[in-house]
Regions:
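Polytopic alpha-helical membrane-helix bundles and their juxtamembrane interface segments
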Residues: 1-210
Length: 210
């Protein structure tokens, strides 16, 4: 492991411990937000320093969109549809990376899951523009995680990162459910970033070494 990677992991660990401590103490606020956003920005910077081939450049582009999406969803706490649309773009770029790695398209599963999710939303009267975007995005993330893990050792780090990404988004969904039991809601509140920053760190580390 190179010196740059060691310092990257140390910095991310410090940011991670900082915002988790603030969130668990219930005193997060602006400081926690700043630490979280800095963690994602540092992931992009590290990816830019590591990128050398097409896979690396695709990850950099995806992390740039991730940072932009988090600006709307985390920093501004507004423009949610735009933020989710940017995350759809992130998954599109990760699909392109998976194809470059030799993974299959998994098109029937992607289309089937998306169609089923949208149909369920229609039947339940829950289909809004924001929900539609989320229901297109989430099946893509799940399929990308499965496709990466199916590649074996070569896709393991990337797949684990995407799997933690799934965990984050499950917590986001739970957090937005009305009437959730207080303990589960409290876990979901912390769990979003408990999973999210490590997912991005693993995705950065999955960039092939030159």
């Amino acid at each position: 492991m190179g010196r740059g990677t060691v310092w990257f992991l140390r910095a991310e660990a410090a940011l991670y411990a900082g915002f988790l401590a603030l969130d668990l103490a219930g005193t997060g606020g602006g400081w926690s937000l700043a630490l979280k956003y800095s963690g994602i920005a540092l992931c992009l910077l590290s990816a830019l320093l590591r990128a050398g081939d097409r896979e690396g450049r695709l990850v950099c582009a995806a992390l740039a969109l991730t940072l932009s999406a988090d600006f709307f969803l985390l920093v501004l706490d507004a423009w949610y549809a735009l933020g989710v649309a940017l995350f759809c773009g992130v998954q599109g770029l990760y699909l392109a990376r998976l194809r470059a790695m030799g993974a299959g398209l998994w098109l029937p599963l992607r289309l089937g899951l998306t169609a089923a999710a949208l149909l369920a939303a229609v039947l339940l009267g829950l289909l809004t523009p924001l929900n539609a975007l989320a229901l297109v995005y989430f099946p893509e993330l799940v399929c990308n995680a499965a496709a990466a893990l199916s590649l074996g050792r070569r896709g393991r780090m990337f797949g684990l990162g995407l799997l933690l990404f799934v965990g984050c988004d499950v917590c986001v969904g739970l957090h937005n459910l009305a009437g959730l039991p207080v303990p589960l809601s409290a876990f979901a509140q912390v769990g979003m970033w408990l999973f999210y920053l490590p997912s991005q760190v693993l995705i950065v580390l999955s960039i092939p070494k030159e």
